[in-house]
Structures are given as C-alpha cells and as structure tokens.
Amino acid sequence: MGCRGQNCSEKRRAIRDHFIVISDSEGEEEKEVIRFGKNIAQPDGRRTSVKRKIAQMTEEEQLALAVRMSEQEANHVNYSQEEEDELLRKAIEESLHSCTVSEPCNTTTQQNTNTLHSTNRTLAAEDCSEKHPISQNCSLSEPPNNITVQQVYKETLSTNEPVKLQEHAEEKSFSQVSALFELPSGAAEQQMNKEAHSTERPVVTGDVVEEGHLSQTFTVSETPLSATQEMNTEDFTTSATFVTEEVGEALTQYSTVSSQSRHKSPVVLLMRLSQDIVESSSVILSPKCRDPFSDMESGMASSCPSNSSNFVSMLPHKALTLSPVFPKQLPRRLGLSPRKLFQGASLTSDSKEQEVDDQCSHCSESSELDYSVLPNSLQAEPFKSNTATEVLKENNTLLNGVTTEEQTGASNSCLDSQRQSGSTVHYYWGVPFCPKGEDPNLYTQVILCQLEVYEKSLKKAQRQLLRKMNFGEPVQLSAPPLRRTERGKADSQDSLSQESEDLKDEDSPRPVDDEEVDSEKPMNQCVSSSSRQPAESLEEESPIPAQDEQDNNSQLILFLNMNNSHSTSLPL
C-alpha cells in the first residue's frame, strides 16, 4: 500500500509540474489539477474495462464484434466518399454556371452601354426629330438584352435554381428600363404595375428595321388586364412615339450580337435520328444525281432541330461516304452447298444462289458493278420471277448515281455475251476471286496449276520421310534361365544329404581314428567337386528335363556312397 501511495503522489506532482495554473487562490489550483487528473484516469479505466470484456468474450462474440467494427468503418468510408463526390459536383456546377453566364453577360453589357448613350442623346432631341414614328401596335416594354439572358438561363441552368435566377434577371430588367427611357412618373408606375400583374415575361418574336422604321412585335402575357391599364399602356406608347435612326441602328447591331451569342451558348440537344436518315446513310452521292437530303430538311426543321441536318446541308456538293447500312430484309437461309468442280453444260441456278448474288452486289465498294468478280454459275440464268427484280430495286436504291435498272441491263448484256462464247467459270472453295481487269478463266487455271505443284511437292516430301529400316543381326536363342539351374542345385544337395544320413544309419558304427577321418575329408571334397563339375557342364550344354536330372543325380550319389563305404572298410 505504501508503494502505491508513493506512485500516486509522484504522478500528481508530475501533473502539477507539467500544467502550471496562474490564479489568486491556492485552493482553485489544486481543484483544477485534480479534475484534470481524473479526466486522464477515466479513459484509462475505460480501456482496461473494454480489454477485460473482450478477454471474457467467446470466439464467436469476438468475431461478431469484429464484423460490426468493420461494417462501421466501411460505412464511414462510403459516407466520406459520397460527401466528396457531392462537393465535386457542386464545384463543377458552379464553374459551369460562371462560364455560361459570363459570356453572354459580357457581350450584353458592352452593348447596353452603347444603347444607353444613343438613347440618352435621342430622347433629349424628341422635339426636333419627328420623322420616324413607331407603329402604335407595338409596346416597348423591355430591351432584348434581358430576353437573351433569360433564354440562356432557361436552356442551360434549368437544374440550378431557375426561380432565383429569373428574379435576378427581372430586377436587372427593371433597372435597365428606368435607365433607358426617361418617362413621366405616372407612365412608369403604370408600366411597372402591368409587368407585376403579368405571369410571363415578354418574348421577342421578330426584329426588323427597314428604312429607319422600327417595327417590333411583342407577345404580352395572357393575363386579363383592366381597361384602365390598357389605356395607360396606350398613353405610354404615345408619350414615347418618336425615336431617331440611331436607336434603330443600335438595335440592329444588338440583334446581330444576340444571335451570335445564342449560337455560342453551350446547349447540347441529344436527339434521336429518324429512320429516314439511317436508311439514307447507305447512299453514296455523286455530282450527277440529285441531293436526296434536300427534301428531308424541310420536314426535319420543324420536328427535330438536331445538328445532323445542318451537317448534311453544309456539305451538299461533297460525296458523303458514310458507313453502309443494310436494308431490312426477311430472315433467309443461305444455301452453302459446295460448287460443282467441273465445267458442265447446265446453266440452271436456284433462288438461294440468286439471293447470295444480290447480297454480293449490294456490298460491292467499286464505283460501277463489276460482274466479273461474281461467279458466272450464279449469273448464268436471267431473272425469271418479278419478285426477285422488285427485291433488287428496293435493296439497291442508289449507287454512285447509277440506278439498278441500268445495272440489270448491263448484266443481261454480259450474260448474252458469255452465252455466245460458251465458256463458263467455276470458282472453287478456297480460291480467291479474280482481281479487276484480268481474265477469270486464266486466273483459275493458274491457281489450279499452283495447287497441283504444291500437291506434288508434298508427295515428294512425304516419300522422303518414309524410309525402310535395314535388317539387323539375327536373334539367337539364349540358354535356359538361371533360376531353374539354381533350383536344381538346391534339390540335388538336399537329396544327397538325406541319402548319406540314411546310409550311415544302416551301416554299423565302427571306431575310427582321428587320422583316418582327417584323410577322408580331403578325399570326399575332391570327389564331390569332381562330381559337381561334370553335372554342371552337362546342364549347361544340353537342357534336360527336371525328372531326368533327378534320376541321374540319384544314380551318381549312390555310386559315390558305395565308393565311400568301400574305402572305409579297407584296412590301412
């Protein structure tokens, strides 16, 4: 306990030395230091408690806790990424807004300064200039500057708070009206009231200046106005009846600038192409034929104001080589039967072969149809049925200014000439088509000759590969396997040992000296070795059956035993 108290006092002293508090009373210093120490001790205690809980938890609970922690981290990361994406989108929208608004505003502000100077000069000299009156049917409500800004806002910034932008534009328009036209107080108030009651802003429908007479038509809102207000508008128009030629020139300049700014506005209209343009894109134009897109422009101008019609109208004299688009056809099965490999007199062809011919002629890229490229077996028979000719006319509308009727006439003439000559060309699978300007018959003959040469060279190479093997040395029969000889030796030894034991038992035992025994051992060894050597030589020289070998061995053993018995019985 004493050690723990000393450690706590040392920690408190270190905390006091680290954090110096300047105050009037000593008690406040101690309280603040103690509070800070408690705040430090609290997170340490929490950590230890959390560690204890984790240690007490089972493995499954720990896994569940780890999964929860990972999910929380993933959600936090996803949320931060979403926030960053939103900030990027906002920044991009603001930059686009600044770019789109700055261009038309710069052009309009420069023009507004010119119009202000011109109108101030002209309105000051109203009494002197009475030559160019304005038609009373018009009502000068606003300059067209605000109209262009409003249109740009409606087209480009429809997603970025359009209501606030329109209100801002309206405030600008009111200030510009008051600056442009120095009107009497009553007329100005009436005009402001009229614009406040209206729900829609006036839109310019046409700007025309002819010989100083300014004729503008404005479409005012459809809200009903009282008779007093209409009279007030008439008074307003009569009060500002005279404008000089300078105002007309300024307005014409502004109309040109506003039209240029409208073309420059970055508005992209994604329109879907009509079926007519898609089908006509396969047509290749030439200077001889009529432009088929001229009739199309009148219909497309009202329905879809896309950029494709402008692109086509800009290039009426150039040959448009667009990507080929195949016309709609019924699903057909192509007959992929192999061609005849010999030149026959039959010139008949099926309808399926005619369909293949039609497709080949439609996909040709040359300026004129080259019928020498196509196989004559397909071109041999003329078109008998009317349906086939109709399909040809529908598929091949225009091809370099030459219609299908002329092409069919040319093909018929070619067929007649081929019939007169009597030569037919048969293309084979794998043989390329004849190039332009060469005789197809000679071309096929050359290729067939090349194929023959290739086959002959292959045969020669194969003959060289197939070589006969020379006969080797004759195979001699080998001696009988060693296993049989080893087994025979083992059997002979066993039989010898058994017979020798039997013979010893039968004979009566006699006392024999040690010297006799010693003399008998080398004799027996010599006899056994001599008996084994001829037996082995006999076995190696001629293969004998197992039974014969056993009989011979038994006879030899008996003979040797008899000799041994006689030698032992003889006295020394």
Curated annotation (Swiss-Prot):
Keywords: Chromatin regulator, DNA damage, DNA repair, Nucleus, Repeat. It is found in: Nucleus. GO terms for molecular function: histone binding; K63-linked polyubiquitin modification-dependent protein binding. Its main location: nucleus. Component of the BRCA1-A complex. Residues 525-534, 552-572 have a biased composition (Polar residues). PANTHER family: BRCA1-A COMPLEX SUBUNIT RAP80 (PTHR15932:SF2), UBIQUITIN INTERACTION MOTIF-CONTAINING PROTEIN 1 (PTHR15932). This is BRCA1-A complex subunit RAP80.
